[in-house]
């Protein structure tokens, strides 16, 4: 059985950035396993711009952004296998995978970086009544059809869900000549970035209906129309608010699910809120030497933040391999406690002796809060109290903690992160 220092599962933006980072931190024996026919992951179908402003200080399209990292991977001589499906990873970090060239094979890894990304929530998870006619697509499938395959999914479109992919596809379908009649969102707020609402809906005169959902789909062979209804505070349709829209296509942008079947199979502890692994300050899971980064850990807004997180995971995996897999003592872990409006934090625990000089704690809120404060309490003492005009679930928030700051509290047990009103 062949042994590698680091095996990276997934060749998308997270996997590529983690590989480059591990190589730059002194590890030569790296393998990327990617199930698609090319590296780059979802970026290959994201032909719009808006990528790279943080990482490269310039605006790039998705394929351009991926291309920068793919070039680095090739220049650094990092090995990768395409069209390769990882079937299983054991607790001892034996990776079982298969492809056409090698058949079914096993690899022993000293460290594993999970970078599988996420998948879209399908129609089946929504329980929409009606037949199953042609013309219902997830927004990402429609994006692939239009941008890569060169097929037009339909001419009259309704979009359910205001996640970033749905907003971007509203603009894309309009540019391709379709009529996007409405974007409906179940929640009383949009799930996407503010800039996407402005650039993709407002600029094209596409209406956004908040607190609305699809309650019926018309058509047997092909979608002929849908019925929208307003929902109450519990998400239940309000009788008498129904509106009919004729359309031949319904796109669903109703959330993303981190793809963690392999992680669960190997015994990684999961966070029920993010559907991703629980990680410490090194982005390491409960299994020593298994790290996670990118959308498999929690769903990000910007690929730049995925790359930043993956860079840290690559560096920490390299440090683990160099230390010959010696586990660090975890007795004095500080637990991060998200409450009062904060849904989760990544990481979930911090060991001060193990962390870099600064750590970024990322989190999402559970609703829209205006004129509020993002606060962090070190046990009972409020240390961070930052004014924010508005925070919303569609935009990831972050606070930065320094090692110097944490060392001033030697007995610190809990950091509580919450939203406070004036």
Model-flagged regions — what are they?
Residues 68-90, 95-97, 174-261, 357-389:
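A Rossmann-like FAD-binding core segment of flavoenzymes
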Residues 104-105, 111-208, 213-222, 289, ...:
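Predominantly flavin-linked oxidoreductase catalytic cores and closely associated redox partners
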Residues 4-68, 72, 144, 148, ...:
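Beta1-alpha1 glycine-rich phosphate/pyrophosphate-binding loop at the start
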Residues 304, 312, 316-386:
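Mid-to-C-terminal Rossmann-like scaffold of FAD/NAD(P)H-dependent oxidoreductases
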Residues 362, 394-406:
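Exposed aromatic-hydrophobic patches
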Residues 374, 404-422:
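Short, aromatic- and glycine-rich surface loops/edge beta-strands on solvent-exposed regions
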Residues 1-9, 67-156, 232-240, 251, ...:
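FAD-binding core/adjacent interface of flavoenzyme oxidoreductases
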Residues 114, 136-146, 249-300:
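FAD-site-proximal beta/loop scaffold in flavoenzymes
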């Amino acid at each position: 059985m062949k042994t590698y220092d680091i095996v990276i599962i997934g060749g998308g933006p997270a996997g590529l950035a983690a590989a480059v980072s591990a190589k730059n931190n002194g590890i030569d024996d790296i393998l990327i396993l990617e199930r698609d026919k090319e590296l780059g992951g979802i970026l290959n179908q994201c032909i719009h711009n808006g990528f790279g402003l943080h990482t490269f200080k310039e605006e790039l399209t998705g394929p351009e952004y991926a291309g920068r990292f793919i070039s680095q991977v090739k220049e650094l001589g990092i090995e990768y296998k395409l069209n390769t499906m990882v079937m299983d990873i054991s607790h001892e970090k034996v990776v079982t995978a298969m492809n056409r060239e090698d058949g079914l094979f096993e690899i022993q890894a000293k460290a594993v970086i999970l970078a599988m990304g996420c998948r879209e929530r399908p129609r089946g998870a929504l329980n929409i009544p009606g037949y199953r006619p042609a013309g219902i697509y997830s927004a990402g499938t429609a994006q692939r059809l239009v941008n890569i395959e060169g097929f037009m999914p339909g001419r009259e479109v309704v979009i359910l869900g205001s996640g970033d992919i749905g907003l971007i596809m509203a603009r894309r379908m309009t540019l391709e000549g379709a009529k996007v009649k409405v974007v409906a969102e179940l929640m009383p707020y949009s799930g996407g970035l503010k800039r996407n609402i402005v650039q993709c809906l407002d600029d094209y005169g596409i209406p956004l209906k908040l607190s609305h959902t699809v309650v019926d789909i018309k058509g047997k062979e092909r979608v002929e129309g849908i019925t929208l209804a307003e929902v109450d505070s519990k998400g239940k349709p309000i009788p008498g608010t129904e509106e009919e829209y004729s359309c031949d296509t319904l796109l669903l942008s109703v959330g993303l699910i981190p793809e963690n079947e392999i992680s669960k199979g190997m015994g990684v502890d999961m966070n029920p809120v993010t559907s991703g692994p629980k990680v410490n300050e090194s982005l390491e899971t409960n299994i020593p030497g298994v790290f996670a980064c990118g959308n498999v850990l929690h769903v990000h807004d910007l690929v730049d933040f995925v790359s930043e997180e993956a860079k840290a995971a690559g560096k920490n995996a390299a440090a683990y391999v160099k230390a010959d897999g010696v586990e660090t003592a975890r007795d004095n872990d500080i637990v991060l406690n998200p409450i009062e409006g904060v849904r989760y934090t990544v990481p979930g625990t911090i060991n001060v002796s193990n962390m870099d000089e600064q750590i970024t704690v990322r989190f999402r809120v559970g609703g829209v809060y205006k004129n509020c404060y993002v606060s962090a309490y070190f046990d009972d003492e409020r240390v961070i109290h930052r004014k924010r005009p508005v925070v919303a679930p569609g935009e990831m928030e972050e606070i930065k903690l320094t090692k110097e700051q944490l060392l001033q509290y030697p007995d610190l047990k809990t950091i509580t992160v919450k939203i406070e009103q004036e």
